[in-house]
Regions:
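Compact, glycine/acidic-enriched structural inserts
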Residues: 80-82, 86-143
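Short loop/turn segments at secondary-structure transitions that flank enzyme active sites
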Residues: 65-67, 89-92, 111-113, 185, ...
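N-terminal "leader" segments that precede or initiate the main folded domain
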Residues: 1-6
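A broadly used, surface-exposed interaction patch
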Residues: 42, 46-93, 98
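Cysteine-cluster motifs in flexible loop/terminal segments that predominantly coordinate metals
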Residues: 393-421
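N-terminal ordered "arm"
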Residues: 7-66
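Short, structured segments at the rim of ligand-binding sites
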Residues: 39, 76, 411
């Protein structure tokens, strides 16, 4: 329960006036310090008074005071800056590496906090804090949602930077790979990212003006042109791919990675690849164009896309279907903007120190409708309704990074739950 002690100390959930060290010194807590998530003492730069004398330094917390020795802190000069040791059980005196004794206090977690925390960890309901959500103070709910939105921005930007490294810092390539992944709309996301990493962009660019050749490379690298039989269009693509494959030394991915189960025909990989081919063909400098587009509708117009004529009457190679345009629905477009465009606006804005792009990312989310998925529906059921995409992104972050990981101690709703009497 050491984590819980950290929590009790950080939020001062203890009787401040009755705090004394094991040797009887009166303790006045001015500042509990900054929580440390890396190696070293648990809290940095705490301020407190011991019998009226001001001390500024670090705090270390353990279940038992003997853990100080168990963890080797007595021999580590990095812990000589500790001015107060906190433990729920005092079973020994402790000292710095030079032999100086360190003041200690026994901190008992309040029974109500312990009981509430146990409820959060052990309840079968999801989320476990559902009882108090309707009664959350409006300011608490609003400020927490805002913080979660920024946290999600930062998390996505970090993941994007990792992808950017794989692309040798090429933002256009990283953008298309991210866009391709999100064209998988969950089920085929991994397959689309694998496929996109197989695309030789510099080679493809040489044939960008020819949609047929782009399709040949795109479908060929997806492993979808491996069969020897097919209709006329399929065989023409296969022949073209064979030539380009030899020319550029292309190696296709394993076609078994593509998933079709429970997919509507409009979501089949064939259609999504055809749409991406058309987009790549007509939108040179795709990321640059999007960065220069100031309106949400303008971004939608760029991404809306379409397909070559063959796909108007087909969902896969072979059997035909009634003719209909294969453009992205508004819902699909908005998801691509949320998960790709907004992320790049924010990350690229940070990279270039361009606050306008960062602000545009936020305004796009506020303008877009809230996502409608099982996560947002769950929160709405318990009283947290998303009014726009910024809210829905915050609620997704809350579930994935706090509820699923049982990080109730780091959640502001968890805080409200724990401090109940």
């Amino acid at each position: 329960m050491e984590q819980l002690l950290h929590y009790v100390w950080k939020h001062k959930i203890f009787p401040l006036k009755e705090l004394k060290t094991t040797t009887g010194q009166q303790v006045e807590v001015i500042d509990t310090g900054l929580a440390n998530t890396d190696a070293g003492p648990d809290f940095f730069n705490a301020k407190l008074k011991l019998d009226g004398v001001l001390w500024i330094g670090n705090i270390e917390i353990h279940e038992r005071s003997s853990d100080w020795f168990k963890h080797g802190h007595h021999a580590d000069t990095g812990y000589n800056s500790v001015i107060l040791h906190i433990a729920s059980e005092i079973d020994t005196e402790i000292s710095r590496s030079n032999g100086e004794r360190i003041p200690q206090i026994q901190l008992i977690c309040p029974e109500a906090v312990r009981t509430n925390y146990k409820e959060l960890l052990e309840t079968d309901s999801y989320p476990p804090c559902y009882r108090i959500i309707p009664s959350l103070p409006p300011f608490t709910a609003h400020s927490w949602m805002t913080a979660l939105q920024m946290e999600r921005f930062e998390q996505k930007a970090t993941l994007l930077n990792e992808r950017l490294k794989r692309c040798q810092g090429n933002w256009e390539d990283a953008f298309f790979i991210t866009l391709a992944r999100n064209f998988g709309f969950g089920l085929n996301g991994d397959a689309f990212e694998t496929w996109a990493h197989r695309l030789p962009f510099r080679a493809v660019d040489k044939h960008r003006n020819d949609l047929f050749q782009i399709e040949a490379i795109f479908f060929g690298q997806a492993g979808i042109l491996e069969d020897s039989d097919g209709d006329g269009y399929y065989l023409r693509l296969k022949k073209e791919y064979t030539y380009l494959q030899h020319k550029f030394g292309l190696i296709p991915m394993d076609a078994s990675l593509w998933r079709f189960l429970r997919l509507r025909p409009a979501n089949f990989p064939h259609i999504r690849i055809a749409q991406l081919a058309c987009l790549y063909h007509r939108a040179y400098g795709l990321l640059s164009r999007i960065m220069e587009t100031e309106t949400l509708q303008g971004v939608r117009d760029i991404l809306k896309g379409g397909t070559s004529e063959y796909w108007l009457t087909h969902y896969t190679f072979g059997g035909s279907s009634p003719s209909r345009p294969k453009t992205l629905s508004n819902t699909s477009l908005d998801l691509l903007i949320i998960n790709t465009v907004v992320t790049f606006l924010y990350a690229y804005g940070l990279h270039k120190g361009n606050r306008v792009l960062c602000a545009r990312a936020g305004s796009f989310l506020e303008e877009l409708k809230a996502e409608n998925n099982y996560i947002t529906r769950m929160w709405e059921q318990y009283g947290m309704k998303a009014s726009n995409a910024a809210d829905s992104q915050a609620l997704i972050q809350l579930k994935k990074e706090y509820c699923d990981k049982k990080k109730c101690l780091y959640c502001r709703i968890g805080y409200e739950y724990l401090k109940r009497k």
